[in-house]
């Protein structure tokens, strides 16, 4: 059985292992809605009851199709990237309701990512989400962030219910400190009553060759209520569920979900074309084209040496 955590404000429990929907969508693996739906259905059929997505991920259709006809309760979290824009935030709420085919959004976050959580940038969107929570359209509101200071600011904010921070064993992607400092901020936020669900435990797939250690590092932190793990095949769902439930994992399943099944992907929305990855690629597989990093998959050997040099965590192995 997958471990669960109870969320008082929703009146239900969620599995600590959640399905992260970013990698399956057009920004990364580019699964069709039907292919993505197979992953979603495999996840819920395996007992996963928590899914994370966002307006910009383009995966609402994948999720809605995967849940069509499913009778179990599934909690979905999504995000708005609207800054200083109440109108856009309202549009994102309506888009989520329609796209996910729901009459209520369980959790909706300000998609801060690498931007600071400040009243100037995010106040209007947060106010919009809070209003939607008050009228029953949204269950809980909060932020997603790669920043320690933003976690701390959200922990002090009286309207924040949920914090979705970046945390992994090497601190890859944290923009303003170390793993230990982020863990300290997470513990403070949890003590303040915030529901914490983590992202990037595998650093965008870069720790897939050491996934057992990477997953245990995050799941063993009691202050982290749940962890989103990106999965793009039913076999990956099976591996994660079995491993985190303490069930035997066959060598065959491990081999089928290992590095050989992955590809290097650049998140273009995050990439600024700085060229650091190109400089550190010893195989000539990376170049800058039209201001963005590009991968020659014929030359890429998935060594992952480029990823630590990307300050924006734009390089993913999916």
PLM segments and residue spans:
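Conserved, mostly hydrophobic/aromatic
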Residues: 7, 19, 43, 51, ...
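Acidic (Asp/Glu)-rich catalytic clusters
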Residues: 8-14, 45, 63-74, 94-103, ...
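Iron-sulfur cluster-binding cysteine motifs and their immediate structural context
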Residues: 55, 276-294, 305-318
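A short, structured active-site edge motif that brings together acidic residues
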Residues: 74-85, 108-111
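Active-site groove signature of glycoside hydrolases
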Residues: 97-116
């Amino acid at each position: 059985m997958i471990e669960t955590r109870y969320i008082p404000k929703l009146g239900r429990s969620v599995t600590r292992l959640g399905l992260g929907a970013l990698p399956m969508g057009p920004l990364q693996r580019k699964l069709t809605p039907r292919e993505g739906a197979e992953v979603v259905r495999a996840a819920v059929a395996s007992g996963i009851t928590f899914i994370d997505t966002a307006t910009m991920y383009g995966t609402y259709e994948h999720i809605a199709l995967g849940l069509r006809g499913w009778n179990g309760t599934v909690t979905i979290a999504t995000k708005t990237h609207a800054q200083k824009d109440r109108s856009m935030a309202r549009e994102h709420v309506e888009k989520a309701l329609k796209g996910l085919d729901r009459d209520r959004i369980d959790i909706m976050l300000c998609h801060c990512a690498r931007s600071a959580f400040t009243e100037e940038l995010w106040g209007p969107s947060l106010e919009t989400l809070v209003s939607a929570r008050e009228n029953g359209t949204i269950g809980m509101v909060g932020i997603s962030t790669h920043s320690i200071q933003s976690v701390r600011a959200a922990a002090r904010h009286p309207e924040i219910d949920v914090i979705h921070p970046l945390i992994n064993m090497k601190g890859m992607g944290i923009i303003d400190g170390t793993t230990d400092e982020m863990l300290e901020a997470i513990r403070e936020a949890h003590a303040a009553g915030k529901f914490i669900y983590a992202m990037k435990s595998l650093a965008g797939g870069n720790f897939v060759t050491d996934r057992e250690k990477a997953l245990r590092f995050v799941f063993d932190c009691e202050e982290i209520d749940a962890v989103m793990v990106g999965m793009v095949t039913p076999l990956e769902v099976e591996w994660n569920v079995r491993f985190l439930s303490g069930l035997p994992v066959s060598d065959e399943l491990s081999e089928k979900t290992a590095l050989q099944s992955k590809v290097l992907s650049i998140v273009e929305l995050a990439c600024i074309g700085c060229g650091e990855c190109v400089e550190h690629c010893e195989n000539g597989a990376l170049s800058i084209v039209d201001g963005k990093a590009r991968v020659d998959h014929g030359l890429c050997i998935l060594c992952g040496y480029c990823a630590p040099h990307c300050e924006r965590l734009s390089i993913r192995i999916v």
